[in-house]
Regions:
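Rhodanese-like catalytic fold shared by cysteine-dependent sulfurtransferases
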Residues: 1-27, 34-66, 74-111
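Short, surface-exposed ligand- or partner-binding patches at beta-edge/loop junctions that are enriched
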Residues: 69
């Protein structure tokens, strides 16, 4: 069974576009593991481990206009798909993730 006409309802954006959305007030959710989060994360992000989100997605209170981030953009794309399935609008996957953030020389926060 082909599903080619199934539309993906989240945007896959790189660092410059993500930074603009953050300035516009988008929520940033980091879905990496605790040890990764503790090494440093995008300033202002909140932390929900991907498996926790997938186990009970509706409990996480994801709002419209959310950017999901992980190390590179793979796990965050899974979270983005789940958010869209929950009916969240204007979902963005940060393609490049915290690696791109650090590579650009941008600051990170630690808990």
């Amino acid at each position: 069974m082909e599903m080619k006409n199934q539309e993906v309802s989240f945007r896959d954006l790189k660092i410059d576009d993500v930074r603009k959305l953050m300035e516009e007030g988008y929520d940033v959710v980091d879905v990496r593991e605790d040890w990764e989060w503790n090494k440093g994360h995008v300033p202002g992000a909140r932390h929900i481990v991907l498996n926790t989100f997938l186990a009970n997605p509706s409990a996480q209170k994801i709002r419209d206009k959310t950017v999901f981030v992980c190390q590179s953009g793979e796990r965050s794309s899974v979270a983005s798909e789940m958010a869209v399935a929950l009916g969240v609008k204007d979902v963005v996957n940060f393609r490049g993730g915290t690696k791109a953030w650090r590579d650009a020389g941008l600051p990170v926060e630690t808990p």
